[in-house]
């Protein structure tokens, strides 16, 4: 906000790391520093768990079109440049096989699947009660046979109580993690989801649920498999290769 008020040419954010990385280096040893990426991608990464920068800071910079440089306090390295101008097209033409920018993980998630025959009025009552209880839902999946969603584990007991009150049949799983794969370059690219599925199945990692948007794919996996899932996907999309442009 200060950079926007001062009409700054750049906003420099100094941290204890060299820039924004393709994954958490504590989980993936060969995670790479992103040299240049877009506001939207970093916003998505931050919202999905990346800790280096707050999503609101990126939103303000994007609103005023001010590039952000995320750099280390202890190095002269240029770090990560966040701007409207992405190098994704150049990376594609240069043979970079990755259509992803980064991978993050969110833990402490509970998954609910409601198997009762839900009429429209019952669905409406359910979601109204969840809203009244200030329970935020994620990964919502509604079909004719079932309704599924995830919540933070600290609200799972409240959800169970509401479902019990409505006398709904449901299953709950509390030991799950959400893997988020972010990348503007995967928009319209065939085979991305197939690669995700094949990579996880090849490592015998169960996929509990998936959903996607234009720039993000979310995969729900058992918590105990999350580290192996991130490492396998990071390798499969070649995010471990040094970024040179």
At which residue positions do the language-model features occur?
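C-terminal catalytic "cap/lid" subdomain
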Residues: 1-212, 216-245
